[in-house]
Curated annotation (Swiss-Prot):
A Gene Ontology cellular-component term: cytoplasm
A single BP term in Gene Ontology: protoporphyrinogen IX biosynthetic process
Native source organism of the sequence: Orientia tsutsugamushi (strain Boryong) (Rickettsia tsutsugamushi)
Name of the protein: Porphobilinogen deaminase
Top enzyme category: transferase
Enzyme Commission designation: 2.5.1.61
Cited PANTHER family: PORPHOBILINOGEN DEAMINASE (PTHR11557:SF0)
HAMAP family documented for this protein: Porphobil_deam
Subunit-structure text: Monomer.
Other facts noted in the record for this chain: The porphobilinogen subunits are added to the dipyrromethane group.
Family, similarity comment: Belongs to the HMBS family.
Highest classification ranks of the organism: Bacteria, Pseudomonadati, Pseudomonadota, Alphaproteobacteria, Rickettsiales
Amino acid sequence: MIIRVGSRASRLALIQAQAVVQKINDLLGLNAIIIPIKTTGDLIQNKNLYDIGGKGLFLKEIEYALLNNTIDIAVHSLKDVPAYLPDGLQLAAVLERGDVGDMLVSKIANKITDLPLGAIVGTSSVRRRIQLLMLRPDLNIVLFRGNVDTRWNKIINNEVDATVLAAAGLQRLNYDTSRFCNIIPQSEMLPAIGQGAIAIEARKDDKLIMPLCAKINHQLTWQLIQVERGYLKTLNADCNVPIGGIASYIGNNSFEAKFMLGDYNMRYFFYSEVRGKLQHGYDIGVEAAKNFQKRLFI
């Protein structure tokens, strides 16, 4: 039996898809192959995502292939997966999560606070932008689209003073993160919802594929992302809303989660920490979002 695995065609996406293929082949004894698919998000590099349709542009063509049965599963970076999926599709599994953090990539500074006054920092993420400006209002934030390789090369070529990249992506691409790279503490920058996790999407009614996905699902990662996605779904924020969060296991079937919600124009910035049992994680994430909504409408 051949399992057709749909993926974006970028180097990082294909590495992540290969990790899923390896799980399918090794654990299930099946033959999985990768079908690379060009997405709109990959093709349009000169505009902010929120001006052209959001992160869903990295999924649109892949999900179309899934709905039309030209692939059997789709592999995504979970942080790119919107709160709500097209009818007929659902998240079927996640692999064990990688590093959840963001890294400051800069030749001239090891920490955000060490950047010179008015330093130019490239990012297209509104989440990263607002957290950078909360810490350093003097920074000059400029649009910085492109895959990891493109953004890394812009640092090498001194086009900007710094950028921020997901640690998991750099590690999966085998970058030497001892050069120019330093983890940003969560006290300064919370990651995107789902950051570091590789997600598998499938057709809800596929009675063959769904059980296979369950067999390679990493249960603890799955439970923790329910907390984060409960928060995300309740806010139903698009990619022009600065939103972040991370749920971490703390033992005894319990988790701790940190959430942030901001405004692009810096009119407000909310932060909260919650704890609870994993079996109640989704509902606790929902409640955290509702508490922010209440503060907005007081």
